Amino acid sequence: ICNKFDNVKNTFFIDNEDCETTIDNEPNENIKDNNTLEDDYSKIIIAKKDKTIVGFISIYLIDESTAEICGFVLPEYRNNNIGNYLMEKLSYEMEDFYISIPVAKDNKTAPNFLRTNGYYPSTTECSMVINTDNIVEKPSSFDCSFDFKKTENENEIIFEIFKDNNNIGSCFVSIFETCGCIHNVEINEAFRGNGYSKLLLQYSLYDIKNICQNIVLHVTKENVPAYNLYKKLNFITTSEIIYYDNL
């Protein structure tokens, strides 16, 4: 969802075969009882004024249960409830489906628009980064009662932490040309709450500090322990995306 005063030239290509629904028509009823998206499902809901397309919502089918939705209204036609009409049609068309819409934190237009149409914030996803020059903890300073294992695959490294020969957790690091990306950080449930994830991450970060300049990760703010841990490890939040759901 774009900001109100975006100074951007936009070009869209719309196939007439996909334009099956307009805001002047009754919503179609192609949704099946088994909650799957069918190949004949309406791809675009369009709004016209004097035979000119002034806005639309497109539904790109990814698979039978997933779709990517894009909405746009020409700037000169905004504030005329066209977007609300389109969202109303969309909500009717997809009333049996869960819809989650990502919005940048600095977007001042989208939140009110979405709330008006029955979408409310559920989670906030943060992108975080650390420059490897800021990683100074040395493995020699770690508790010697722990063992670490490193497994290298193509473009990916797996780190594991052991205590008394028990595997208590692991994390994955994907290696790209410009950065590394930490993901799938997990401590076995019986060992959580003891600071083991911090030890695992410190070891992993120090090991890869000479491989890439920056290391990134994604975490939801609602995952308070993980979010606070990354901040303690000097990760900096670079962007936030708020997800609005049709609750």
Where are these regions (language model features)?
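Conserved active-site tyrosine of GNAT-family acetyltransferases
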Residues: 110-115, 119, 230, 235
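Short amphipathic alpha-helix that is part of the acyltransferase structural core
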Residues: 1-35, 120-166
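Conserved donor-binding loop and adjoining core beta-sheet/short helix segment
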Residues: 6, 10-18, 33-85, 171-180
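Conserved acetyl-CoA-binding loop-helix of GNAT-fold acetyltransferases
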Residues: 79-92, 193-206, 227-228, 232
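Conserved beta-strand-loop-alpha-helix junction that forms the acyl-donor binding cleft
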Residues: 100-111, 217-227, 243-247
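Glycine/small-residue-rich hydrophobic helix-like segments
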Residues: 167-214
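A short, internal acetyl-CoA/4′-phosphopantetheine-binding micro-motif in the GNAT/acyltransferase core
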Residues: 70-79, 185-192, 219-220
